[in-house]
UniProtKB/Swiss-Prot annotation:
It is found in: Golgi apparatus membrane. Pfam families: Glyco_transf_8. It comes from the Eukaryota. This is Probable galacturonosyltransferase 10. InterPro entries: GAUT (IPR029993), Glyco_trans_8 (IPR002495), Nucleotide-diphossugar_trans (IPR029044).
Length: 536
C-alpha cells in the first residue's frame, strides 16, 4: 500500500515543533535555575540592632561617698553618727528589757541607712530638705534614750559592771580548771596501779627472782665504787623510774660504769625490785640498787623537821582536813605530796649514800637523751650543787618563790638572785658534808613551821639551803617545761636531760601529746605485765 506524500510532510512538521517546545522548556528551566542561584548567593542586610544604653553611660563624675561621710559639715556624716549612737542604745535597751524601744530604734536605723543608700546610688550629696524628717525622728528617739539614762556615763557604768561580772566568771572558771587539773595530775592511773599489784604478786610468788636479785646485790662492789657514775632517783612510780634508767642506759657511752640507786616506799618496794630484776638483761650492763626509805633508821621525827611537823595538829589539818580555807590558799599549796619523804630525801643524800663522793640526782619525770658521764668531771669550784639556772625571766628569781615581806628572808637573800631547778643536779657530797648543808636545810625548815617563809614544795627550801653553794651548769644539760608549756624543738634536740615538770606528765592522759613520744620511746610496751595492765 502506497503512502501519501502529505502524511510524510505532516509527520516531519510535528517532529520540528516538538523539538522547539523542548528547547523552549529547557531554556525556561535554565533561567529558573540561574534565578534561584542568584537569590541564594545574595545576603540581605539585617536590620541594625540599636546599641543598648546602660545606666553607667549616664554616670558622670559625682560625689565621693567616703569623703562625704568624713566631712564634719555634711548631712551624711550627721546621719551616720546618729546610726552609730542608736546601735549602742539598741544593745542597752535590750539588756534593760525595753524591747519596744529597741524595736523603734532598729526601725529608725533602717530608715537612716536607706537614706544613705539612696545618696550613694545616685552619687549626689544628701540635702537638708530630703533628710530633715529622718534626722528629726532619730533625734527624738535619741533624746528619749537619754531620758531613760542611756547616756554615755550610764553606758560606761553598765559596761564596767559587765566587765567585772565577766572577770569574776572567768576567775571562777580558771579556779575550777586549776583544781580539776591538779586532781588529774595527782590521780594514779588505773594501769599504773594494776602494774604495781601484778609485779608485787610476781615478786612474792617467784622465789627464784628474789634469790637472783639478792645474790647479785650481795657481791656487787660497784655500789660504792667512786670511779663509776652514780645516779639516784627517789620515786614511787615504777614506769617513770624505768624510763629514767632505760634512757640513761641506752644513751650512755659506757653503760657498764653506770650505777643507779633507787629509793622508793614500802608499798612499791617489792614491785620496783621485781621490775628491775625481770628487765635487768635489757639495761646494757647498768647496775641497779633498790631501797626503801622506811629502812633508814636515822629518818625519824627527832632528826627530820618534816616528820616532826607531820605530828603537829595544825599541819595535819592544813594538808589533810579537806577544808578549803575559804579559798585563801590555792589547792596546789595544800598537796600532801610536798610532805612526802620521797620529795625531801634529796636533802639527805649524804646520809642515804655514806660511801659516795659525787652523785647525779634525777627526778622521775625526766628523760635522758645524751651521755651524762661528762657531768662527773665538771669542776663545781668548791660548790655543793651543780644546776642549770632558770633566771632568763624575772619569773624564776628568788622573789617569786619566797616571802620577802618576812624580815628573815629579806635580810638574808637577794630577791633578784637567780633561781635554778631540781631535776638534774650534780652534788659534791664531800663538800656537802664539810659545809653541813643538811643542817642548813633543817634550820630553814624549822623556821617555816607556820608556812610564812614559803608555801609550796621543795624548791624554795632548796634555794635557801644551797644559796651561795650552787655552780651554774650549761643550759643544754637540763631542758625544763615539757609538762606545762611549749619548748623550742631545737632546744629539745640539743638537750641532754628533758624534764616534764608541771602537771602534764607524759604517763597521764592530760600530758602534752607532741612531747609524749620523747618519753614513750623508752617504755617497754612488749612486757607481758604492761600488756596485762593495758598500757598503750
Amino acid at each position: 500500500m502506497r503512502r501519501r506524500g502529505g502524511d510524510s510532510f505532516r509527520r516531519a512538521g510535528r517532529r520540528k515543533i516538538s523539538n522547539v517546545v523542548w528547547w523552549v522548556l529547557s531554556g525556561i528551566a535554565l533561567l529558573l535555575f540561574f534565578l534561584i542561584l542568584s537569590k541564594a548567593g545574595h545576603i540581605e542586610p539585617r536590620p541594625s540592632i540599636p546599641k543598648r544604653r546602660y545606666r553607667n553611660d549616664k554616670f558622670v563624675e559625682g560625689m565621693n561617698m567616703t569623703e562625704e561621710m568624713l566631712s564634719p559639715t555634711s548631712v551624711a556624716r550627721q546621719v551616720n553618727d546618729q546610726i552609730a549612737l542608736a546601735k549602742a542604745f539598741v544593745v542597752i535597751a535590750k539588756e534593760s528589757k525595753n524591747l519596744q524601744f529597741a524595736w523603734d530604734l532598729s526601725a529608725q536605723i533602717r530608715n537612716s541607712q536607706l537614706l544613705l543608700s539612696s545618696a550613694a546610688t545616685r552619687r549626689s550629696p544628701l540635702t537638708v530638705l530630703e533628710s530633715e524628717s529622718t534626722i528629726r525622728d532619730m533625734a527624738v528617739l535619741l533624746y528619749q534614750a537619754q531620758q531613760l539614762h542611756y547616756d554615755s556615763a550610764t553606758m560606761i557604768m553598765r559596761l564596767k559592771a559587765s566587765i567585772q561580772a565577766l572577770e569574776e566568771q572567768m576567775s571562777s572558771v580558771s579556779e575550777k580548771s586549776s583544781k580539776y587539773g591538779q586532781i588529774a595530775a595527782e590521780e594514779v592511773p588505773k594501769s599504773l596501779y594494776c602494774l604495781g599489784v601484778r609485779l608485787t604478786t610476781e615478786w612474792f610468788q617467784n622465789l627464784d627472782l628474789q634469790r637472783t636479785l639478792k645474790e647479785r646485790s650481795r657481791v656487787d662492789s660497784k655500789l660504792t665504787d667512786n670511779s663509776l657514775y652514780h645516779f639516784c632517783v627517789f620515786s614511787d612510780n615504777i614506769i617513770a623510774t624505768s624510763v629514767v634508767v632505760n634512757s640513761t642506759a641506752l644513751n650512755s657511752k659506757a653503760p657498764e660504769k653506770v650505777v643507779f640507786h633507787l629509793v622508793t616506799n614500802e608499798i612499791n618496794y617489792a614491785a620496783m625490785k621485781a621490775w628491775f630484776a625481770i628487765n635487768m638483761d635489757n639495761l646494757r650492763g647498768v647496775t641497779v640498787e633498790v631501797q626503801k626509805f622506811e629502812d633508814f633508821s636515822w629518818l625519824n621525827a627527832s632528826y627530820v623537821p618534816v616528820l616532826k611537823q607531820l605530828q603537829d595538829s595544825d599541819t595535819q589539818s592544813y594538808y589533810f582536813s579537806g577544808h578549803n580555807d575559804d579559798g585563801r590558799t590555792p589547792i596546789k599549796f595544800r598537796n600532801p605530796k610536798y610532805l612526802s619523804m620521797l620529795n625531801h630525801l634529796r636533802f639527805y643524800i649524804p646520809e642515804v649514800f655514806p660511801a659516795l663522793k659525787k652523785v647525779v640526782f634525777l627526778d622521775d619525770d625526766v628523760v635522758v637523751q645524751k651521755d651524762l658521764s661528762s657531768l662527773f668531771s665538771i669542776d663545781l669550784n668548791k660548790n655543793v650543787n651543780g644546776a642549770v639556772e632558770t633566771c632568763m625571766e624575772t619569773f624564776h628569781r628568788y622573789h617569786k618563790y619566797l616571802n620577802y615581806s618576812h624580815p628573815l628572808i629579806r635580810s638574808h637573800f637577794d630577791p633578784d638572785a637567780c633561781g635554778w631547778a631540781f631535776g638534774m643536779n650534780v652534788f659534791d657530797l664531800v663538800e656537802w658534808r664539810k659545809r653541813n648543808v643538811t643542817g642548813i636545810y633543817h634550820y630553814w625548815q624549822e623556821k617555816n613551821v607556820d608556812r610564812t617563809l614559803w608555801k609550796l614544795g621543795t624548791l624554795p627550801p632548796g634555794l635557801l639551803t644551797f644559796y651561795g653553794l650552787t655552780e651554774a651548769l650549761e643550759a643544754s644539760w637540763h631542758i625544763l617545761g615539757l609538762g606545762y608549756t611549749n619548748v623550742d624543738a631545737r632546744v629539745i634536740e640539743k638537750g641532754a636531760v628533758l624534764h616534764f615538770n608541771g602537771n602534764l606528765k607524759p604517763w597521764l592522759k592530760i600530758g602534752i601529746e607532741k612531747y609524749k613520744p620523747l618519753w614513750e620511746r623508752y617504755v617497754d610496751y612488749t612486757s607481758p605485765f604492761m600488756q596485762q595492765c593495758n598500757f598503750h
